[in-house]
A protein has these predicted regions:
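Hydrophobic beta-strand positions that form the internal "hydrophobic ladder"
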Residues: 64, 106, 148-149, 191, ...
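A short helix->beta-strand "capping" segment at the edge of beta-propeller domains
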Residues: 30-49
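Short loop/turn segments that connect beta-strands within beta-propeller blades
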Residues: 78-81, 120-123, 163-166, 205-208, ...
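WD40/WD-repeat beta-propeller blade N-cap
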Residues: 45-52, 88-94, 129-136, 173-179, ...
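WD40-repeat beta-propellers
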Residues: 73-76, 115-118, 139, 158-161, ...
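Residue-level detector of Asp-centered blade-edge/turn motifs that repeat once per structural unit
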Residues: 59-60, 101-102, 143-145, 186-187, ...
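Conserved strand-to-loop turn within each blade of WD40 beta-propeller repeats
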Residues: 67-70, 108-112, 152-155, 194-197, ...
């Protein structure tokens, strides 16, 4: 879910007293040579003409999408990894993508300053949302409402849209630098954003509320990714220094810091168990972590900068978008559990 700009330099009442939040927590580090777990099989299934900076799997685990600096979006089938179609229309690199909760639509964010909505069955472009005054970096569908989507931008704002009506619902302001990513909680109550200002902000999804409910502090570098767990009880964030932080929700308590990678972390994804998180980095590795203990449970050397990733809900397949333009599937052939609805990204 990452983008090339990284290389350049009653809820409101309940949360009102919680800004900013900064508490004691546990720190863990990856050990050299540790956390290898089972060996994963890597398969390159196709490619874009340039870096692949976004990956998102649909809720049914039957399809995933990738986006690229080459200005295109590609749809792929699961589990076989067959390329289904290429979506074109953006006139700038496509920075991020998100499926709607019902899997019928895909939202994309681009440096052309637009958010576009696509029909995943036909490939038709359903809407073009204009309003940001700079590159659009993050995009995320509300998982309980397929007409509502959030976006972030270099213009420092978060915008909420009803794409079916073609209207901007509200603009959220508060970050002092570019906003990098956004995510809805899966219970539909909260929205999280992260920024180069090294903070995360938590917002209410209630229409009248425009002020941040809380600001989460603790990162020492620009925060690149933010993501809720399936059960909405945890929030994960990653930064340019290769650090992951785990926050308890809805309190905002910082419960764990993981010194995960030697390069910036381009993407994160929760597994369905709410206890496992997968990270990918420009250090060329993909790792899995137990969020309760901070243990590094798997390390895979991709041999190339990992720009984006996602994982099927049962954890059987990890999809990678890489700096060399390749799209890869990592799988554990010894773990063939049944499929379940996704919800961790």
């Amino acid at each position: 879910m990452k983008r090339i700009f990284l290389l350049a330099a009653g809820l409101a009442v309940a949360f009102a007293a919680m800004t900013p939040v900064s508490v004691a927590q546990t720190t863990s580090s990856a050990k050299a040579g540790g956390g290898q777990g089972k060996a994963l099989t890597s398969k390159t299934i196709g490619s874009h003409a340039d870096e692949v900076i976004g990956v998102f799997v649909n809720d049914a685990n039957s399809q995933f999408a990738t986006c690229s600096i080459d200005e295109t979006i590609k749809l792929w089938s699961l589990p076989d990894g067959k390329e289904l179609r290429t979506l074109t229309g953006h006139i700038g690199q496509v920075n991020n993508i998100s499926y709607s909760g019902d899997d019928k639509y895909l939202a994309s964010a681009s440096s052309d300053r637009t958010v576009r909505i696509w029909n995943t069955e036909t490939g038709a472009q359903e809407a073009v949302l204009k309003g940001h005054t700079a590159e659009v970096i993050g995009v995320y569908f509300s998982q309980d409402n397929s007409s509502v989507v959030a976006s972030t931008s270099f213009d420092k704002t978060i915008k909420l849209w009803d794409w079916k009506l073609g209207v901007e619902l509200k603009t959220l302001r508060g970050h002092s630098m570019q906003t990098n990513n956004v995510a809805y909680s899966y219970d539909g109550r909260l929205l999280a954003s992260c920024s180069d200002d090294r903070t995360l902000k938590i917002w209410s999804t209630d229409a009248p509320v425009r002020e941040a409910l809380m600001t989460l502090e603790g990162h020492a570098a620009p925060v690149l990714t933010v993501l809720f767990s399936f059960d909405s009880k945890l929030l994960a964030s990653s930064d340019q220094d290769g650090v992951i932080k785990i926050w308890s929700m809805p309190t905002g308590d910082l419960i764990r810091t993981i010194n995960a990678h030697t390069g910036m972390i381009q993407d994160l994804s929760f597994a369905e168990d709410n206890k496992t998180i997968i990270s990918g980095s420009i250090d060329g590795t993909v790792k899995s972590w137990n969020v309760e203990s901070g243990e590094n449970t798997m390390t895979h050397a991709a041999g190339v900068e990992v720009w984006s990733l996602d994982v099927t809900s049962n954890g059987n397949i990890i999809m990678l978008g890489c700096a060399d333009g390749t799209v890869r599937l990592l799988s554990d052939s010894g773990n063939e559990r049944g499929r379940a609805p996704k919800g961790g990204k």
